[in-house]
Each structure stands twice: as structure tokens, then as C-alpha cells.
């Protein structure tokens, strides 16, 4: 099943009602996220569960649910990749080395036996 976002209008009078609603909905299989807006009296459920099952679960605790919308959840905006500064490889300069060779020739008697 696909993930759905379900918005349900439910009367939320007190903290006890809020707690009972949260407990009842989170017991369902396939529920990923549950949020309650107490000022607007809206329950938002995200998951793979059936909206009818959510409404029935709320009826079991004597609430009168009104389904506002059922649809796919909003996908988060993709964050733009931060631009990376280009990495410059330093150029290694070639420094020629001077090579000095010294050849010494002995001039002399030519006798190698000492």
C-alpha cells in the first residue's frame, strides 16, 4: 500500500480526550506519524493504514470523526546542494638541477704497480 496523509476533524475538549485519541490511533497497524492540532481540532495521520479503520477506531472511543482529506503526504522540499569551492591543485615547478662531473686523469709515469 502507498503512504497516505489523512486529515480528520475530531472534537478535542481536554488533555484526556487528546491522550485517548492519540492512543487509539497509534494502536492501528501502518501508522507512521500522528499529530493533533488542538486549536483547529484536526487530527493528521500519515501511514499506510485505511482511512475507514482510523474513523472506526475513533468511533470506538465515542468521538465523531469527519474525514476532511485523504491524499499523498507532502514531500519535503529538496535542499539545494551547497556549492563547493573548486579545489586547486598547486603546480609544482620543475627546477633543473645542475650536474657537475669532475674527471681526473693522472698524468704520470703510467706505472700502476707500486
UniProtKB/Swiss-Prot annotation:
Positions of modified residues (Cysteine methyl ester): 111
Residue stretch(es) of the prosequence: 112-114
Keyword list, A-Z: Lipoprotein, Metal-binding, Methylation, Prenylation
PANTHER family: COPPER TRANSPORT PROTEIN FAMILY-RELATED (PTHR45811), HEAVY METAL-ASSOCIATED ISOPRENYLATED PLANT PROTEIN 2-RELATED (PTHR45811:SF33)
InterPro entries, sorted: HIPP, HMA_dom, HMA_dom_sf
Domain HMA: 3-69
Binding-site residues for a metal cation, renumbered to this chain: 14, 17
Pfam families xrefs: HMA (PF00403)
Protein name: Heavy metal-associated isoprenylated plant protein 2
Family: Belongs to the HIPP family.
Annotated GO MF terms: metal ion binding
Function: Heavy-metal-binding protein.
Classification via PROSITE patterns: HMA_2
Lipid-substituted positions (S-farnesyl cysteine): 111
Organism: Arabidopsis thaliana
Amino acid at each position: 500500500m502507498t503512504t497516505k496523509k489523512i486529515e480528520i476533524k475530531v472534537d478535542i475538549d481536554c488533555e484526556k480526550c487528546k491522550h485517548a485519541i492519540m492512543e487509539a490511533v497509534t494502536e492501528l497497524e501502518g501508522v507512521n506519524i500522528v499529530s493533533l492540532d488542538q486549536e483547529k481540532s484536526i487530527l493528521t495521520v500519515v501511514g499506510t493504514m485505511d482511512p475507514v479503520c482510523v474513523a472506526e477506531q475513533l468511533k470506538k472511543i465515542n468521538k465523531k470523526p469527519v474525514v476532511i482529506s485523504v491524499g499523498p503526504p507532502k514531500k519535503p522540499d529538496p535542499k539545494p546542494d551547497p556549492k563547493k569551492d573548486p579545489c586547486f591543485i598547486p603546480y609544482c615547478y620543475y627546477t633543473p638541477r645542475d650536474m657537475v662531473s669532475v674527471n681526473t686523469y693522472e698524468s704520470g709515469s703510467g706505472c700502476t704497480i707500486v
